[in-house]
Amino acid sequence: ATLLDQSFIAGLGNYLRSEILFFSKLHYRDKPALLKNNQLTNLSNQIKKVSLRAYVQKGRTLKYDKFKELYGNIENFRKIRHMAFARSRKPCFHCGQIIQREISASRRIYLCIKCQNQGKQAI
């Protein structure tokens, strides 16, 4: 929920929040005060990496290499932009679990409940 708080980090849109948490393997309900140091470090790194990747790739957070690994070609790279965001009811690229859409603080958030297992990640 911290990433949803504009006083913590301003300017993160819904898609960046979903993607940062996905790449950090954190659930949006995880409390920052209860995260391990390595989880906090990873979260900090992912905020920078995912934001920069989205900027460089014109809003895409799906890495080009991961896309090529999944699909073998680049023809549809423009159509598939994210790992979790706006992919509700579609399989997770990592584990195959169905991506879920939830509402938190009046904002939509997308997550894989298997990859982002609340409170149980030991990154």
What are these regions (language model features)?
Residues 1-123:
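Basic, nucleic-acid-binding surfaces and adjacent catalytic neighborhoods in DNA/RNA-processing proteins
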